[in-house]
Amino acid sequence: MKKIKSFGGKSLGGGKQEKILKDFARMQEELQKKIQELEESFSQIEVEASVGGGAVRIVATCDRRVKDIEIDEDLKEDFDTLKDLLIAGMNEVMEKIEKRREEEMSKITQQFGIPGLM
């Protein structure tokens, strides 16, 4: 990197700027690696939502995959209620997934001094 001279003839950069840029690039690589590892771990983190007093229970992973749905036998005959509870349960589990993803991402960004990245 070429040093730039100011009006007084003093150097305005060079060594310090290069070090800062190299440190920033290294930190960016580390952050990207940690985020990639976190994304891969989301398939192992489960979130659960239960609605209708436990009549419908949905288990999903943080990579947004539904893993299991349990439905109370009493709902077998009441399609409209079942449908409403499934919608409510899916919405709740998705909200929980997003919250958990944000919490996990926050742990990483705080390590790098980057608050509120997600």
UniProtKB/Swiss-Prot annotation:
Binds to DNA and alters its conformation. May be involved in regulation of gene expression, nucleoid organization and DNA protection. It is found in: Cytoplasm, Nucleoid. The keyword DNA-binding applies. NCBIfam families: DNA_YbaB_EbfC (TIGR00103). Homodimer. Keywords: Cytoplasm, DNA-binding. Belongs to the YbaB/EbfC family. GO terms for molecular function: DNA binding. SUPFAM superfamilies: YbaB-like (SSF82607). Its main location: cytoplasm. Disulfide bonds: none annotated. PANTHER family: NUCLEOID-ASSOCIATED PROTEIN YBAB. GO terms for cellular component: bacterial nucleoid; cytosol. Signal peptide: none annotated. This is Nucleoid-associated protein TM_0687. InterPro entries: YbaB-like_sf, YbaB/EbfC.
